[in-house]
Amino acid sequence: VTGRPEARSPAPSPQPWRGAGHTPPPPHRVVLTITLGGVPQLRLALNQIDSRVGDIAGNADSVVRWTRHSAEQGAHLVAFPEMVLTGYPVEDLALRSSFVEASRAALRSLAARLADEGFGELPVVLGYLDRSESDLPKFGRPAGSPRNAGAVLHRGEVLLTYAKHHLPNYGVFDEFRYFVPGDTMPVLRVHGVDVALAICEDLWQDGGRVPAARSAKAGLLLSINASPYERDKDDTRLELVRKRAQEAGCTTAYLAMVGGQDELVFDGDSIVVDRNGEVIARAPQFTEGCVVLDLDLPAALADAPVGVVDDGLRIDRVVLSEAPLPPYEAELTGAYADRLDDDEEMYSALVVGLRAYVEKNGFSSVLIGLSGGIDSALVAALACDAVGAANVYGVAMPSKYSSDHSIGDAAELAKRTGLNFRTVPIAPMFDAYMDSLGLTGLAEENLQSRLRGTMLMAISNQEGHIVLAPGNKSELAVGYSTLYGDSVGAYGPIKDVYKTSIFRLAEWRNRAAAERGQTPPIPENSITKPPSAELRPGQIDTDSLPDYPVLDAVLAMYVDRDSGADTIVAAGYDAELVTRVLRMVDTAEYKRRQYPPGTKISAKGFGKDRRLPITNGWRESV
């Protein structure tokens, strides 16, 4: 897959409602200005932006554009997210010395470029990929191993570098596979304020740079982050930052990344709190922007601590400017962005993830098989909001088992959204196979699905669209899908969404459209009719599966929380049902391995954060 997106504009606005008949909300730029009361003052610019992994030149261009914007806002200190220069996560690119050296060279070039463009006096903090300068092996890694690093650029030079101290090695994170940890407590003195610097996990884990910031008597703790989205994580993040600010004893700024990378979504939601844990600024979710704050912070101490502090971290102090700025009047324009409710947040994450995957991989259009059911209808609505209805192509592929209402529901969806639509019956191909092979039962059912998959891939090859797979988490968990049939595609937008949430999101999307005076995109019949694959007469999903509320509750315990069979039964679920569902999950691992990537929105999706053997003799028993 090749291609490169167009250069990002300096202040893009989100477009969650692009598509026929859907008017996007008014664009807005995030510029928040706050004063706390006290001296000296510091205007901090937090650039909550997107990056594309591997596009070092494009990411550097973005840093320059947003630095220019920050300078226009009068910033005194500018910050960008974790590994913004390389994108995050870089995975095994970190093991390629050529990529590491390209990152290091780009950092030096960026420092010179910022100075050439007139921003040399403006200190810029950003993340990049570095390597250890140590001549000795460390933590079982050879000398010169990669580092997840941050840097301060000033006057055309790389003034200060530091590496992430706490390395996450859980869920989707494999940072111990790639990086060696940092052992310094970087403190930058700028305009008479000591600013302690941290990177993401340095806040999420106890110890390390948070207590070290207190020991160093910092006035501000600035953490640059690339922490992926999960449902309900925003509340956890807020409480974390509040707690760490109190532990550090200083104002704490948590700068987040925004955008998508393969299966991960970054939701923004940057936060600044005072030393007492009170929130003074919170940025929008899923939106690029620049948060500008006028902060009154404690003056740096003349005899500030030096040497080794908490967790063996050595204070690494760099003085840029001792003298405070002349007093100026701080303007308050607003500080707390509106929060999204749970359904809108989840839907927005799915839109951002899909849009990022399509655009960052150089595609401009998507192709979806439309059955008239709720899964393909929700995927179509997401696609219209992500890339615009004019770039969405839907194909209905009815068989002799397809109901009239399903065919009609697919056409109605196309009419409501304005997507491109065609109907191609599979009967001639199906009859040819049946005449040749005489298939019956499940083989006959799956043949229909595989013919549809073949047709979608043929159209994709001919017309250049990327195929979207409509499978949901409930179906993938129990293997209720057909390999090389409904599982074909390059991306699965609802791969990590349980069926019960599919219904809720569809209802929310329609309700949101109605509240805006727009046409609800999803036909009501697609939401209310019993789910069915329609591969045999009268078929409905509950012929093969428990009711979805029960199924999803069992799956949430087994898949998301790793509960055993005894624990699930003790929670009130029938032992025979639990045994059956768990066996279906275990024996479907080989199918899930062949499913395309898709947006991760839960704490544990079917991807890097759930790794089980295919050949596996272990079975849960009650």
PLM features per residue range, with description:
Residues 28-369, 385-386, 421:
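Enzyme catalytic cores with a strong preference for nitrogen-chemistry domains
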Residues 40, 249-250, 275, 299-371, ...:
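ATP/NTP-dependent adenylation/nucleotidyl-transfer catalytic domains that generate, transfer
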Residues 2, 7, 11, 20-23, ...:
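Ala/Thr-enriched low-complexity intrinsically disordered regions
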